[in-house]
């Protein structure tokens, strides 16, 4: 019902939503027949439906490499995230994880739900990994080794300073950016991007996730996960978990805005990285998550709901981003729109307002200087839908018929 209400409020979401639904069903039918590859692509859909859709942009050989890269790192992340594993057991596994990808027999019981299945049947991932080209294997092994070592370091170390924060995000996400750049280069479709730009691509996504997932991480049992740097949150509260309490709402929002401002420092590097891409499929694969990230930050900024539940873009807006992010002009336009949205929420009384506005103005200037803003229509933000009630009813009926056909064909 929530989706239907959102469509009635935003009728122009309908077409992108239908396209997204059809694309998802198409992706489900593209599962390879080989058992190990079938497992990998099915598992990809279970652990990240959005990534499973975005990866379809890539040619088959590169798609396979990126799929395995993602699952290997997701498995590594599952070990790191499982707070029930004793430190003396977890650290050696993280450090040696890169060796296990060559072992068809290795598995490790941890995680929950689909992540437990991934870990229990990791031999399928190893089997698929061993069928990749050597350059792909070397890139995946190298990044997995470096990431595992970095994760192990922060198992025993808190994120105290913003430098620690950048270092942690480098290990768990910046290295993903470096690895993807290596895979793109190994495919022969892209020049090798600089480490600094690749790192920023990962940091921007990771910091967005850390901001959005505050409540989930702080409520993790048996032990909470704390990724917000003490250097930032200690300016507002005595303990990180204090941010979720209603009596600290004003300070919590100020701290949140500080975190968002920190994340915005990576945007210009991300725009440069995407501008330098040549292959249209790789471009879409990289650009869609970045647009989703700036959109998510715009939703989270100055929003107390981050400390009450999950804040994310509505499904129709997500569908628009996936459908309409095709060129660099689209990216500049989306970043411009979401930055304007974010800027409109900045309160001059916020302690970081000046810094936030400075970073947003720099992003807006980069988008304007591209000279492309007048060449595309803004699909991302619409103030009020200009539709008559009759048209809305007609759209609702059409949607009901289409959804009935889509779901009816399954039975």
UniProtKB/Swiss-Prot annotation:
Annotated positions binding NADP(+): 49, 74, 212, 312, 314
Cofactors demanded by this protein: Mg(2+)
Cellular location(s): Membrane
Biological process, per Gene Ontology: farnesyl diphosphate metabolic process; sterol biosynthetic process
GO cellular component: endoplasmic reticulum membrane
Transmembrane segments: 388-408
Membrane topology (UniProt): Single-pass membrane protein
Catalytic reaction equation(s): 2 (2E,6E)-farnesyl diphosphate + NADH + H(+) = squalene + 2 diphosphate + NAD(+); 2 (2E,6E)-farnesyl diphosphate + NADPH + H(+) = squalene + 2 diphosphate + NADP(+)
Family listed: Belongs to the phytoene/squalene synthase family.
Name used for this protein in its record: Squalene synthase
Provenance organism: Solanum lycopersicum
